[in-house]
């Protein structure tokens, strides 16, 4: 079995880093934050150091912040006409569930809901 796995790695059919990068793209498509993406990668079997490294690279390129803003825009559209406190609470809840950090959520909420 080890020889087969080694051969698959050698020919490029098994590449953990490419898989992790693909999984991060999937997470961003679902508007997840850094913490949520790391947890999702770990759930999918990516070892934690690799998951954190790939997510750090994605964070540096700003994709998680972009995802938070898109989440905020969608939340604002869905809750239009509701009480402002309800709108903020729903946004914060969804952002927290998706693993966004409080600093980013605060900036988005201030801009879109205040």
Give names to the regions the model predicted.
Residues 1-114:
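An alpha-helical, amphipathic repeat domain used for nucleic-acid recognition
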């Amino acid at each position: 079995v080890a020889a087969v796995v080694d051969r698959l790695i050698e020919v490029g059919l098994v590449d953990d880093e490419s898989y992790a990068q693909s999984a991060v793209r999937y997470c961003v498509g679902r508007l997840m934050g850094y913490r949520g993406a790391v947890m999702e990668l770990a759930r999918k079997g990516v070892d934690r150091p690799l998951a954190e490294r790939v997510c750090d690279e994605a964070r540096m390129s700003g994709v998680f912040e972009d995802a938070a803003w898109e989440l905020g825009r969608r939340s604002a559209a869905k809750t239009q006409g509701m009480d402002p406190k309800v709108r903020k609470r729903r946004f914060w809840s969804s952002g927290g569930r998706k693993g966004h950090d409080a600093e980013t959520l605060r900036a988005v909420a201030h801009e879109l809901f205040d």
